[in-house]
Curated annotation (Swiss-Prot):
Region described as Disordered: 73-93, 116-202
Regions of compositional bias (Low complexity) in chain numbering: 116-132
Keyword entries, A-Z: Late protein, Repeat
Protein's UniProt name: Uncharacterized protein B407L
Organism classification: Viruses, Varidnaviria, Bamfordvirae, Nucleocytoviricota, Pokkesviricetes
Start and end residues of each stretch annotated as 5 X 5 AA tandem repeats of G-[S]-[IV]-R-[DNS]: 112-136
Sequence repeat intervals: 112-116, 117-121, 122-126, 127-131, 132-136
Listed Basic and acidic residues bias regions: 187-202
Family indicated by similarity: Belongs to the asfivirus B407L family.
Induction: Expressed in the late phase of the viral replicative cycle.
Length: 407
């Protein structure tokens, strides 16, 4: 290969005139250095590689110009079958199966064949020819190490040739291309299906308009129907708002801070008002349910443990009389928390279950309320029949009796 002159050095012409002499060695001849740089010949890196390759081949006793080491030559010893008793030898002392891979050999080393430029320093690893592992005397004498065979199939298959390797390599390449093509088709179908799904919702309105035009032929009527449908929906939601306002008014719950929408309001404003009124109505109802359930439990404890019954194995007689009054005070301060707890419980319940939850505590509390009223009436009647001498004393006794029975 001929040396190639790099013409980029021409750009340095006259550079010595631009240099500052104060920063340059006085003994240096700038003009001479410029001439050396301008006329320097530089070769490609491949030339250095070829020199190393030729030196390695010479040390191994290989001549690239010899037809015996050429795959294209019919007289090549590499393509011949080796002969011998238990030894696989070829010309030059290189075994047939010592330079091979398991399945598909590379272009440079396959089926025991050695192309021009295939043996390089340190390029063949693990069971092949390493730099310095094959001695000069062993190559010249035709002897190599034993046990460098790749696998048992390469030992037994004496007729394994380069064409077989190429055939297997081509088959593997074809199978890989087939696998890639199948995967690409699958991804393409998945992407197309995803794009269709994403397009369908956005074209729903357009499809409705096209169908309407095909049937009626008047686009204005289509938009008129759509406007009428929206107006009807607003009227239904406004009626729901009026019902909620009525319920909250009966419970004496203020709604002055909520702006009531009209038919001209947007759908979003109407939905926001419905949500606020629903939360306010449901919050009161849910807190009432929690209060009734907990007060019912307190009433049950008062009936069971009134100070006369003893707990077995504990020798303890608890008296929970008046516990429901304490519960009422505590629960009134926690109306928001109780409404949240009940709301989470009844969120997924059916309407029938909600009705049972509303009426269940009342069924338990009703007998206790009736008994309290009857007891208050009897005490007041007995007090009036007694007829105390001092009217102020009678008034105080009546007041204390009513206060006691109302607890």
């Amino acid at each position: 290969m001929e040396d190639t002159t790099f013409l980029e050095g021409a750009n340095l012409a006259g550079i010595t005139t631009l240099m500052n002499n104060l920063h340059i060695n006085e003994q240096a001849n700038l003009e001479e250095l410029e001439k050396q740089v301008m006329g320097k010949q530089q070769s490609f890196p491949t030339d250095h590689f070829d020199e190393e390759l030729n030196g390695l081949a010479k040390s191994l006793g290989i001549n690239f110009n010899d037809p015996e080491f050429s795959l294209d030559s019919p007289h090549s010893v590499i393509s011949k079958k080796p002969s011998g008793r238990g030894r696989d030898k070829v010309h030059g002392g290189i075994r047939r199966d010592s330079v091979c891979t398991d399945s598909i050999c590379s272009d440079s080393v396959c089926s025991g064949s050695i192309r021009s430029g295939s043996i390089r320093s340190g390029s063949i690893r693990n069971g092949s020819i390493r730099s310095g592992s094959v001695r000069d005397d062993s190559v010249r004498s035709g002897k190599t190490r034993r046990g460098l065979a790749c696998n048992s199939s390469s030992r037994n298959d004496r007729g394994y040739s380069l064409s077989t390797h190429r055939k297997k390599y081509a088959e593997s390449e074809a199978s890989q291309k087939t696998a890639f093509s199948k995967r690409d088709r699958k991804n393409h179908y998945a992407e197309s299906e995803y794009s269709e799904k994403s397009i369908k919702p956005s074209t729903k309105q357009v499809d409705r308009l096209i169908n309407h035009l095909r049937s009626n032929g008047d686009p204005n009527s289509f938009y008129k129907k759509d406007h009428d449908y929206e107006r009807k929906t607003k009227l239904v939601k406004l009626e729901k708002i009026n019902m909620l306002l009525t319920y909250l008014g009966n419970e004496q719950i203020s709604t002055d801070d909520i702006k009531i929408p009209t038919i001209d309001s947007s759908m979003q404003e109407i939905d926001d008002v419905i949500e606020m009124l629903t939360l306010r109505n449901v919050g009161i109802r849910y807190s009432s349910i929690a209060e009734e359930i907990l007060i019912g439990l307190a009433r049950g404890l008062e009936i069971v443990f009134d100070g006369t019954r003893e707990i077995p194995f504990l020798n303890y007689r608890p008296d929970y009389t008046g516990l429901h009054n304490t519960f009422m005070i505590k629960l009134f301060k926690m109306r928001y928390e109780t409404s949240q707890v009940v709301g989470n419980l009844v969120q997924n319940m059916s309407p029938l279950s909600k009705i049972c939850l509303e009426l269940g505590p009342s069924l338990l509390l009703y007998p206790a309320l009736i008994r309290t009223k009857h007891k208050a009436s009897e005490d007041l009647y007995n007090l009036l029949q007694k007829g105390p001498e001092d009217p102020f004393t009678a008034y105080n006794e009546i007041h204390e009796t009513l206060k006691k029975n109302n607890k």
